Amino acid sequence: MYLPDNFPINDKPLRPVINQFQHWDIGHVNTHLPTIYLRIVLGDLYMKNKLIIENKDLVGKWNKIEYQIKWSIRNDGFLKIYHNNQLKYSRENFVTLKGDYLYFKYGIYNWRGAGISYPYKYEFPDQTIYFAGVSASKKREDLKVNKIK
């Protein structure tokens, strides 16, 4: 993942989600809110309220993000998030799958709602993020991101 130097990190209301795991149920149009996602707040990258990457290490540099997840409808799931091979987030013994199906999406997601208030007539600034090596695997060493030189 790469945020160019011109990414609008000083735009205070801006809090884009850059990837998320979504769940949905058979027969329902609405999805559950994502339980696992990364969000940029003033140039820092967070998983909920846990800092994953500081601004000085996020903007203008390539960063490798890896998720290790045990998907479960019971309280035996876990989540680990690695930044450049360093464990930055770990949570165990919680429900990680809240629907019948799961999908992963990445890009820049800004929306009005979810507890975020934007000023009246707020205009979202131009934003660019580059992604490379996005993949899923049963083993970390088989992820595409681990084969990029």
Regions found by a protein language model. Give the residues of each.
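Secretory/extracellular carbohydrate-interaction modules
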Residues: M1-L42, I108-W111, G115, E123-I148
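Short, aromatic/His-centered strand-loop micro-motif at the edge of beta-sheets
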Residues: Y46-E66, W71
